[in-house]
C-alpha cells in the first residue's frame, strides 16, 4: 500500500460510501501532532503511518489507526527544505509484506519492520546511487512490486533504481 491507494491511481473501489452528510457530519476520532510536511497518511494492518519534520529531524510515526495511540517513532537528521516554503517530507511511505519504506526529501531511504519500527536496512539515494536532489527534494513515493522497491534517485546514470525489498541490494537501474 502506498500513495494513491491500492492501485496507486487515487481512486477508491469502495462501494456504498456516504457522500451527503448534511448536519450528521462525522467527527474526528483523534488528532496527532507530527510536525511540518506533505506526506499523506497510509494505513496497513490497523496501523497508520506518516512523516513530519520538526527541529531539524524527520520523524516517521506509527499510530494505532483506531485510537491514534503512538506505537513507535523513528527520527533522523533532516533539515526543512530551503526552497520556496517551509516543509518536511514530501513522499508518502509505502508498506508491503510487513515492511515500511520511506524516502526523505534529503535522500535518506529506510526499510522498517512495520510493526516495531526496527530499521531493517537503509540507503542514501545520493551517495549510494549517484543521485541528485531535485529542486523540491525527493518527493516520489516508493513503489513496491514483485519483491522490489523502486525509487527515483535523480541520477544521470539511471534515475530509477530497483532494490531487493528485503535486503536493499540493487537489482537494476534504468
Predicted regions, residues:
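Noncatalytic, solvent-exposed loop/strand surfaces
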Residues: 1-174
Amino acid at each position: 500500500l502506498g500513495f494513491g491507494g491500492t492501485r496507486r491511481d487515487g481512486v477508491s473501489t469502495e462501494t456504498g460510501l456516504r457522500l451527503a452528510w448534511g448536519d450528521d457530519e462525522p467527527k474526528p476520532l483523534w488528532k496527532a501532532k507530527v510536525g511540518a510536511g506533505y506526506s499523506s497518511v497510509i494505513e496497513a494492518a490497523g496501523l497508520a503511518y506518516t512523516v513530519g519534520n520538526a527541529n531539524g529531524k524527520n520523524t516517521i510515526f506509527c499510530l494505532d489507526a483506531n485510537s491514534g495511540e503512538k506505537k513507535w517513532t523513528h527520527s533522523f537528521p533532516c533539515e526543512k527544505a530551503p526552497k520556496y516554503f517551509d516543509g518536511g517530507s514530501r513522499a508518502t511511505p509505502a508498506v508491503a509484506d510487513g515492511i515500511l519504506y520511506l524516502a526523505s526529501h534529503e535522500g535518506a531511504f529506510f526499510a522498517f519492520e512495520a510493526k516495531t519500527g526496527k530499521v531493517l536496512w537503509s540507503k542514501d539515494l545520493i551517495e549510494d546511487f549517484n543521485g541528485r536532489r531535485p529542486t523540491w527534494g525527493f518527493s516520489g513515493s516508493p513503489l513496491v512490486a514483485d519483491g522490489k522497491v523502486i525509487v527515483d534517485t535523480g541520477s544521470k546514470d539511471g534515475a530509477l533504481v530497483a532494490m531487493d525489498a528485503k535486503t536493499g541490494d540493487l537489482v537494476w537501474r534504468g
